[in-house]
From Swiss-Prot:
It holds the Pfam family Ribosomal_S13. HAMAP family: Ribosomal_uS13 (MF_01315). This is Small ribosomal subunit protein uS13m. Its main location: mitochondrion. GO terms for biological process: translation. It comes from the Eukaryota. PANTHER family: 30S RIBOSOMAL PROTEIN S13/40S RIBOSOMAL PROTEIN S18 (PTHR10871), SMALL RIBOSOMAL SUBUNIT PROTEIN US13M (PTHR10871:SF8). Keywords: Mitochondrion, Ribonucleoprotein, Ribosomal protein, RNA-binding, rRNA-binding. InterPro entries: Rbsml_uS13_C, Ribosomal_uS13, Ribosomal_uS13-like_H2TH, Ribosomal_uS13_CS. One of its GO terms (cellular component) is ribonucleoprotein complex. Located at the top of the head of the small subunit, it contacts several helices of the 18S rRNA. The keyword RNA-binding applies.
Length: 120
């Protein structure tokens, strides 16, 4: 098992698939990182050298917001929406869908999550 940015990467998977385990790195960003390093699409994590790991870490940390930094930015944006009193802020506060989805019969998951977070 290999660790990059505090995330455990499965050593038997391809690099582009394993990188998607990092919060903030999706399939397209993982492919971009591999292309910047010139890595093959089929190379596995356990075949990478120490230098290649360092280069992956360098590229990700310089070019992308990932893991705790990204979570902090998302939380800050939500707090800003709540503080300015906009519609999306009210919906975040109430734990309801933000983007106009139907709530009469749907949106059970949002309300369940809200109930669990209030209860604990």
């Amino acid at each position: 098992m290999s660790y990059i940015l505090g995330t455990n990467l499965n050593s038997n998977k391809q690099v582009k698939i394993a990188l998607t385990r990092i919060f903030g790195i999706g399939p397209k960003k993982a492919i971009q990182v591999c292309d910047q390093l010139g890595l093959s699409d089929t190379i596995k994590v356990n075949k990478l050298t120490k230098y290649q790991f360092d280069q992956i870490l360098k590229i990700i940390s310089q070019n992308y917001l990932v893991d705790s930094e990204l979570k902090r930015v998302i939380q800050r944006d939500i707090k800003r929406l709540i503080s300015i009193g906009c519609y999306r802020g009210f919906r975040h506060n109430a734990g309801l869908p933000l983007r106009g989805q139907r709530t009469h019969t749907n949106a059970k998951t949002c309300r369940k999550l809200r109930y669990v977070s209030i209860r604990s």
